[in-house]
Amino acid sequence: MTKIIVYSCVTNKYDNVEKTLLSSVGFAEDGVKFVLFTDSLANGAKSDIYKAKGSAITWELRPLLWRHSLCKRRTARFHKINSHMLNLDAECTVWVDGSQKLKPISLSRQLVTPLASRYSLASFKHPERICIYQEMQACRKLKKDNPLLMRNQINAYKTEGYPPYNGLVETACVFRKQTQQIAEFNKLWWDQISRYSFRDQLSFNYVAWKLKLEYGKIPGCRTSSQFFEFIPHGKSSP
């Protein structure tokens, strides 16, 4: 079994991943694989490979395993959240958003091993907000999703007794062990996305609280990390 699979998902080349994630110089390691789920495979191919010039890593391109009929974001979220359903035969997975470039460091030694020694789940700590109630207000202000849907979601959590100021993650990177406990976490997380907003940061902390699952904090944040370089959507690095 592969030790670690780093993976992502892109639809309609939304993140322009050939200039971001796929162009990563990266760091080749035994036991670490790289997988991208995409709808851009030619002629219904079951798989392909991609290696950028100057890169140390090779990406395995796989077709999407599920597609929402109307919302490409929910299509991507399915692959992001359901790591246990993607035929990722590995001890651990690391989800990375398509807006990130992998820096030339050992993800196994510097990211995964320290986390795996203590946690089955980890993500970035949000750099600006400290709970899902604040996140919902920010998402409403920025018109990130249907405001009624988000309000109903947060009200449901409040009715259950979910506390304020209970932490907030930034899910540009999500580390997970491939365990039954994490499969249960994924299932409940996806259930929230299916019922409510596709903004997965609104439900991650609720699900961890509901399942009494302690999660770790990945050092840094989406835009400032020792592991990744952030490239805004639609832009490429110099």
Q: Model segments located where?
A:
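N-terminal anchoring/stem segment of glycosyltransferases
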Residues: M1-A76, L86-D89, R195-F198, K210-K212, ...
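Nuclease catalytic cores that cleave nucleic-acid phosphodiester bonds
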Residues: E60, L88, K103, E128-R129, ...
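A conserved donor-nucleotide-binding helix/loop in the catalytic core
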Residues: R67-V96, L107-S108, S203
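Short, high-confidence coil segments that cap the C-terminus of an alpha-helix
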Residues: A90, S117-S120, L213
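Cell wall/extracellular polymer interaction/catalysis modules
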Residues: V96, R129-K143, P147-L148, F227
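Conserved donor-nucleotide/metal-binding helix-loop-beta segment in metal-dependent transferases, i.e.
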Residues: L102-R140
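Catalytic core and acceptor-binding pocket of nucleotide-sugar-dependent glycosyltransferases
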Residues: K144-P238
